[in-house]
Amino acid sequence: MARAKYKKNSRGEYETKVWDGTYTPDGFKHRIRLVSKKSSADLERQVNEIRYRVEHNEYVVESDIYFIDYARDWLQIRKASKRTNTQTMYDNIIEKHLAFLNDVRLCDIRNMHFQMAINNAMDKPRTCQQIYITFNQIIRRAVADNLITSHDAELICMDINLPKYQKKEKRALNEIEKLAFQECMNNGVLTAREKAYLTIIYYCGLRRCEALALSRFDFKKEGGGFYLSVSKDLVFVKNDPLVENKTKSDRGLRQVPVPAPAAKYLQQYITSLPGTNLFYCQNSILITKSSYDKMWMSILNKLNTAAGGSKKFPVIDDLTAHIFRHNYCSNLCYKIPAISIKMIAKLMGDTEKVVIDVYNHVMEEKEDVQTVLEDALNM
């Protein structure tokens, strides 16, 4: 005769504890009490049922937590290691675009709520993408936390209609912008700080966050030339600057050669600095967002004037720092095969795929399809 797996307690009940798929605040497995007055076999059936449901994400712990509270906890706990800009993006989505769900419990969330969040921002396609990513991740995490079932998650996230998002095409400097840049760099209209910033993003192709984080110790001489050591980013938390001792990715850690004309000016600029940071403002050892915005607007106004434009009728008004970075990459791509795609990616602190995309765009501009076809098909 088979021996009973579970024994009766003092009350004559078959009793055990089983893990419900969650954890205590201390990180231990949370176990629930199961009881059967019938038999050990009945209790074993209950145990196996719960274990199966936990294993297949079908077991749900009863909880009255509100969706918005869970979303905030998710951001604080699950995204703590992400870059500040990424955390800010998630926080913006939760507080501005999901806050209308503040009185809805997580267990009551439905597909309708997801679609409503998208519909409320339908005129902002990129924001809708971010809402979709955030909402979807929160729901998937709730499944892992046994707060909703995987089946419910599929129903919540299925058939969400998003507006069509057309990613803005990256571009290099156009001819008008190049001429205006050269004139401003040579005629003395730029402040020392403005000229230093343009020098770095034009001649070295650094991201804005990388350039603003530079200190005098990042400008180094090695052998017969100079280079910039890129190892950190400066991001803005609202208006306040914050230096992160990491780059956008591991590839961002690099040393970028500084061409001779740029090195000569940066040497002069650095000797005039009162502190260690290349870019700062009067009330801060680091540049604030408002100070940066004023500097960039001043640069745009001077470039626009050099191009023959005015405030009322601007010739240059959509220029961004990232366009200078794309221009740097494009100029290097024109030199292939004298320089390899792999080396360009290394200098950019980016992937080879990004460089290949830029290279393909450069080649498209140079292609004479009609002539090539006639030559290729000439019998």
Q: What annotation goes with each model-predicted range?
A:
Residues 219-227, 338-358:
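Short, polar N-cap/turn motifs at the start of nucleic acid-interacting alpha helices
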Residues 9-13, 22-112:
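N-terminal DNA-binding module of tyrosine recombinases/phage integrases
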Residues 32, 38-39, 244-267, 276-298, ...:
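C-terminal catalytic core of Y-nucleophile DNA break-rejoin enzymes
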Residues 183-191, 256, 271-277, 284-285, ...:
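Short, basic (Lys/Arg/His-rich) helix/loop patches that form interaction surfaces
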